[in-house]
């Protein structure tokens, strides 16, 4: 699509396949701020990514904040998913049930699966692995040149730097 084409242009020094990260989405370089022109490691005190559309999760996804956030970021890159499509078709889900074994509480893998259903008030949570899987599956189906990656544990200054470079991140 026309939206996709402009987002996939890269300089010769960039990799063919770009990186999209749950907690950071990367694409072509954007205009720099005054601070970053002078020092690539400088982070502005305040920065707003322009043309970033906010999408509400309610009423359709009462417990689907993570997948709604991913929808907003993918929209920013021109991939235009529907939040319900991402929640239904791409987000890995499992039942939320626990039991005790040898005195330990055992439950499902909340990092790689959404526990329950994000369309239900009884849905619970998912971790980065589930969002990365949903993002990469959707991106692959669209034949887009992005990859989701996990930046968990990185320094906050690195996250701020992504934002100051017009690269939205997802944090929860």
Region roles according to the model:
Residues 151-172:
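Active-site-adjacent substructure of cysteine-protease-like catalytic cores
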Residues 1-128:
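Active-site-adjacent structural segments surrounding the nucleophilic cysteine of cysteine proteases
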Residues 141-153:
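Catalytic cysteine-centered active-site loop
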Residues 97, 142, 169-170:
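Short secondary-structure junctions and interdomain/linker hinges
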Residues 91-95, 140, 164:
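Generic surface-pattern signal
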Residues 134-142:
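Short helix-loop-beta junction
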């Amino acid at each position: 699509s026309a939206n996709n084409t402009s987002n996939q242009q890269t300089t010769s020094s960039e990799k063919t396949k770009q990186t999209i990260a749950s907690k950071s989405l990367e694409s072509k370089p954007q205009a720099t701020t005054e601070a970053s022109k002078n020092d690539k490691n400088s982070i502005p005190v305040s920065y707003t990514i322009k043309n970033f559309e906010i999408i509400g999760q309610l009423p359709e996804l009462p417990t689907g904040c993570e997948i709604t956030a991913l929808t907003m970021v993918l929209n920013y890159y021109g991939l235009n998913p529907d939040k319900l499509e991402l929640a239904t078709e791409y987000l890995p889900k499992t039942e939320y049930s626990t039991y005790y074994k040898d005195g330990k509480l055992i439950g499902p893998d909340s990092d790689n699966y959404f526990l329950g259903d994000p369309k239900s008030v009884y849905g619970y949570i998912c971790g980065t692995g589930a969002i990365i899987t949903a993002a990469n599956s959707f991106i692959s189906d669209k034949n887009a040149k992005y990859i989701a990656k996990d930046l968990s544990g990185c320094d906050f200054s690195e996250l701020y730097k992504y934002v100051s470079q017009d690269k939205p991140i997802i944090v929860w």
